[in-house]
Amino acid sequence: MDISFQIQDAVASVIRAPLASPFRIATGQHDELENVFLKLTTRDGVSGYGEAAVASHITGETVPGTLANLQNAAAALRGQTVDDAESACRQFAAAFAGNHAGLAALEMALLDLSSRVRGIPFYRLFAPVAALEPRLAFSTDITVVIGSLDEARATAREFASRGFKAFKIKIGRDEQLDLARVLAVHEIAPDSQIILDANMGFSAGSMLAFLDRLAAKGVRPVLLEQPVPKMDWDGLSEITAALTGSETLVCADESVGSLADARRAIDSNAVSAINVKFMKSGILEGAEIARLAASRGIRLMLGAMMESALAVTASAHFAAGLACFDYLDMDTTFFLKGELAHSPYLDEHGRFDLHDAGPGIGVEPRFS
C-alpha cells in the first residue's frame, strides 16, 4: 500500500563519469558515461533518484532531448502530492513516447522515493513471478567488448581470476577475429558459460555458419543475443528453428523494446529468450514483458545500457523482486571509474546480495 508524499523539489541534470576503457560493440562505442539523472525530494527531506542511460546508436534518443523531457517532468512534479507512485508513472508515459530511457529515469525516481518513504527495499515493489520469495543473491556475467585478441584474453584472465562464471562476448565486426576471441575466452575459462552478443551484426546464414565453426572447436554458447537486424524477424525465426533442441537459446534484444514487440516475438516463435532492459521499455512495461515471457515459457535475461551503479542496482532489485531471470547482464559498473561505479550490493566477484538491503534502491548520486 502506497503512502502519500509531496514533492517539494525536483531537478534533472547530466552527470558524466570516465570509463576505464572504451566500451565497443558492433554498432558503436561509449568513451564515457553521459547520463541524465533525476532527483525528487519530499517536503520531509526524503529523496528518490532515477537515471536515464541514453544509447543514441541503438535507440536514437539523445541526451539533450532526454534532459528536456525530464526537466519538464520535474517542473510538473514540484509541489505535487503523489498518492500512488505507479499511477503517477503511468500518467507521464505519453509525454515520454520515443524516450524510454527518460521514462525509466522518471519511474525509477518515483518508485525509489515511494519505497524510501514506505521504508522498504526497492525490490519489494515487484512481486515474484513464479517463486514464493524474492531471489536476493545472484551473479552477473562480464562483457568482453569488441577489441583485439589480446584484449579479450586479458579480460578473460582478469575476471576468471575473480570468479566470474559467465562471459558475454561482443561480436559482429570481424568474423575471423571474433572466432579467435571466443576461442581464447573459452580456453582461459573452459568451465564458464559463453554468451554471444552480435548486436545485429550478422545475417541468419552467416550466424549459423559462425556457430558451426565454433561447434567444430567444441564451443557451444548457452545464449545468442540479437544476431540479426532488429526488424529481421524471419532471420531470427530461421536461427531459432535451426537451434531448437540445441544448447543455445536465441535471445531478442534490440528487436524487443515494448510489450507489443515481446508479443510478436513470442507468438511468431522468433526467439527462445528475451533481454529486458529498463532503458528500452521503462521499468513498469519491462515488468509486464517479463511476466508475459515467463508465462509463455520464454527464458529471460536482464540487461543494461551504459549505466551507473544507480540504474544497475535498481535492476538488481528488479531481478530480486520478480525472481524470474535466467541470465543477468548487469556489469557496466566494472567499466566505470569513480563513485558512480559503486553499488553497495555488488562485490568484486560480480555477486549481488540484497539480503541486507535498506529502504529504496540504496544509491544516492551527487548532484552539482
Curated annotation (Swiss-Prot):
GO terms for molecular function: magnesium ion binding; racemase and epimerase activity; racemase and epimerase activity, acting on amino acids and derivatives. Substrate binds at residues 143, 168-170, 277, 329-331. The keyword Magnesium applies. InterPro entries: Dipeptide_epimerase, Enolase-like_C_sf, Enolase-like_N, Enolase_C-like, Mandelate_racemase_C, Mandelate_racemase_N_dom. Disulfide bonds: none annotated. The keyword NAD does not apply. Its EC number is 5.1.1.-. CDD domains: L-Ala-DL-Glu_epimerase (cd03319). One of its GO terms (biological process) is peptide metabolic process. Its cofactor is Mg(2+). Binds 1 Mg(2+) ion per subunit. SUPFAM superfamilies: Enolase C-terminal domain-like, Enolase N-terminal domain-like. It is an enzyme of class 5 (isomerase). Mg(2+) binds at residues 197, 225, 253. Keywords: Isomerase, Magnesium, Metal-binding. Part of a large, functionally divergent protein family. Protein modeling and substrate docking was used to predict the substrate specificity, prior to biochemical analysis. Belongs to the mandelate racemase/muconate lactonizing enzyme family. Catalyzes the epimerization of various hydrophobic dipeptides, such as L-Ala-L-Phe. Has epimerase activity with L-Ala-L-Thr, L-Ala-L-Met, L-Ala-L-Tyr, as well as L-Phe-L-Met, L-Phe-L-Ser and L-Phe-L-Thr (in vitro). This is Hydrophobic dipeptide epimerase. It comes from Citrifermentans bemidjiense (strain ATCC BAA-1014 / DSM 16622 / JCM 12645 / Bem).
